[in-house]
Amino acid sequence: MTLWTVSPPAVSSEAEEKPVQDTVSLTAADQTWQVCVPLPIAALDFAAPHGYVGEVPLGCRVAVPWRGGEIRVGLVVGAGSSMGRHRLREALALLDSPEAPWVAPGTARGLTAWAEEAHLPPGLVWDDLLCTGWEPAHRHEVRAVPGADLSPYGETLPDTDWSRADLYPPALLDAAREQGLLDDRFLPDPPQVNRVVARDLNDVPPAARTQVVVTAQPWEAADPALCTPPHWEAVTGEGALTAKQQQAHDWLRAHGPQPSLGAWASGAKVGLPVVRKVADLGWAQEHPQAVPPPPAWKWLREHGPVASPAAWASAAGVRPAEVRRLMEGGAADYTFTPVTPPAAWAWLREHGPAETVSAWATGAGVSPSVAAGLLARGWAAQVQMPAPPPELPAAPLWAGPPLDELTALAADALPEEDRWRLHGGRPASRFAALAPRVARLLAQGRSVLILAPDHATLRRAWAGLGGLAALAGTRAALLSGQLSPRQREEIWRQVRAGDVRLVIGSALALSAPLPDLALLVVLEEGSDAYKLLSGSRAFVPDVAARVARSLRAALGLVGSVPAVESVPLPGLVLAPPRARVHVVDYAQPPAQPELGPLSSVHLTPGDLGYPISHDLARLLRQVQERGRQAALLAPRRGYSALLRCPRCDHVPGCPNCDVPLRFHQDRRQMECHQCGHHQSVPDRCDECGEQMWKARGPGTEWIAAEVEKLLPGFPVYRLDKDHQDDLAPLHAGEAGVVVGTQLLLAQPSPPNLALIGVTLADTWLGVSDFRASERYHRLLRQLAEWHPSRAPLLVVQTFQGDHPALKVLETGRDALAYPAAEERVRAELFYPPHARLAQIEVAARDRDRAKVAAQALADALHGAGAVATEVLGPAHAAVARVRGAYLYQLLLRARNDARLAELLGVLDTRSWGARVRVDVNPRST
């Protein structure tokens, strides 16, 4: 029974101000729970369910009342304040056992704490990062409290017996619930599936398992008129006979008994009245006489039963009338006989149940109509049964050293600190260095979680480390958004049960309830793919670090190159893979001979070739001549970044955003890559009327067209968000060139890859972001190690051939060289890791309104004590207008998290007249 007096749930201000507790232990009478629901709101305070005894069940799911009588599933993330408990609504029921919470309590604490530190509603973050459990398989039932009168609430309401809650209006149930007149319970209701099963033979309807046939009956038991018909015999009578009568009597005496008066008269050649008079005078009497069975009966006795009288007559070669006479006389009759069970039924008995009638038909080798007919006649039935566990990705086999070698202390060269890093080498060598640590922890009975930013990295990690679990006597699970909801639920069940202790997955795996988590590994921690593009816009490595700290688990950062923020950590740097780099420096053509034998001294900037330089063109021709493979990295999708009028330099732009429209030649469309607006290419310039357009900024479509002209007849493929050719021929080893965006790196490397070309590297540098050069360096490292064993020639076309991010790769420096240099620069300029950043975005449909609100926010920050170095801006965003909204930004820089929280607290002091959004640790500034 639930007892409360206030219907709408309210956010507790005390709970917002209170820090997350490490241990939560209150008596049931005092308990309030902080509950997150998957909505962009703060955690809500609810009283514990009526009669609940125990500690606050951190990480457990709970059913809570919601607006309009709706029931929602929430997650207990902390203890609320006991003040004002009597005003709170009670949670309806706890859906998980506190001994097996849906999320590890440490994860619940850590993730919620990170959301509060990031100035984000925890419900929004949980909605992004908890991939299953918000719609649990429970059946909600209600009943009236004994003695309660629910008639004032309506006619259709439950009585004192449990019944399904969905039979009643939710609002009426909620009204009765508020007054303590209703009991709720939630019973496990596992998913059901329809299956086709074979019925037991005795359960098959008699009409289906028997058939009506015509069967010969014993001849002696037939109607006497049929088997012993009366016959007329001559006897001595009294009285005189006429001559005709005497003739008839003499014939009968001579020829024996006759079956009828007619047969007698016919044989004696007299009329029927004559023989009848002889009989009347007593000179003939009727006596029964057995007759032999007719041929038709004998045939049926030997060959029967038959399906019908007509079939009998036809097979026996007699008239239907003869058959009717025998059946009417009881010499044959309809009988029921068991039929031979159909072969399809026997197959289903042995191999069933079948998922569908079609699957049954296919397995039994019959047509679907035959199977459907058997189902209709009752040989099979469609039933609901608990759904079987879904098939999960199979863990790969471990091909490395045995467990005893892996777990030897000498095999583990990684630091023992709480936070460490491992970078350099190729993916295989990094996994080989990580494997001893993972194997040792799994062998100790502890758990390991490995996060990957994208499907390509996830696929490599699963192949390289997934086999360690079986080696250590446990199981591994692959958890990502590519799995179905049922697969994710099954993995969650196995993890909660302790069957799985190694999880390798995407950001969705961060909240997996692994028992006794010892190590949380973040692969490629600097990858922008970890940044959620909507919702909370969380940067997953930041959340992972907070969760690892809350769980007291070690945090390992592993990748091709460390993020600059990771440089201060202790770690291991592997020797870099061999890289062959050739730079085409558009800015310094006379220096080209120094870069390699491919260039010529006479080249000028205009002669170098664009978007495919002469050097790259020569190499592509060699690829064609030798039947090899090449990959070209384009800076953008589509044909070009923009179209420009050659007369007045007018550039068609998006009507909703302050960006040029991208040109897609294959569709003859211009498209905005911010809002999706698209339109056809205008015939003339809107400004001057010029008919000619000039494309600027080559994309994948343009570069692919150039390659096709350069290499006629050679296979050319495209791979970007808009156009994805089938690369199966390349992966099978066939020659060709693929042109794509960074989506290429999500694919396995073609096996015979000989050349990689970066068509314009400056695109990654020409971004107003302090991380631009770091991204550029990471991209070059990833390209250099893309092939798992070979070192394809990497050709970089650029106007900045002496950029340090490129030079360290060209000169063979290790993976730490450039990030370490960048870290020293950031220390001087007060940027991460030596500062904490938060970007505040102010948006409004009116430009002046957005600008005024942004300035007011900056003034408030300065008024609260922020110094000039802590607040940069306001300034309009890099894209000043998106989807009709004008954007202004401020960048906050603080020395630590506490100071950043103080600055962000200013946002809560008033309303700003515009939409304000906070992005802590932004990935683009």
From Swiss-Prot:
Name the UniProt record assigns to this protein: Probable replication restart protein PriA
Keywords: ATP-binding, DNA replication, DNA-binding, Metal-binding, Nucleotide-binding, Primosome, Zinc
Stored Gene3D superfamilies: P-loop containing nucleotide triphosphate hydrolases
Signal sequence residues: none
Co-factor: note: Binds 2 zinc ions per subunit.
Binding-site positions, Zn(2+) 1: C645, C648, C685, C688
UniProt xrefs under NCBIfam families: priA
Keyword ATP-binding set for record: yes
Pfam families reported for this sequence: PriA_3primeBD (PF17764), PriA_C (PF18074), Zn_ribbon_PriA (PF18319)
Binding, Zn(2+) 2: C654, C657, C672, C675
Disulfide bonds listed in the record: none
Oligomer and partners: Interacts with DnaB (DR_0549). Component of the replication restart primosome.
InterPro entries assigned: P-loop_NTPase, PriA, PriA_3primeBD, PriA_C, PriA_CRR, PriA_helicase
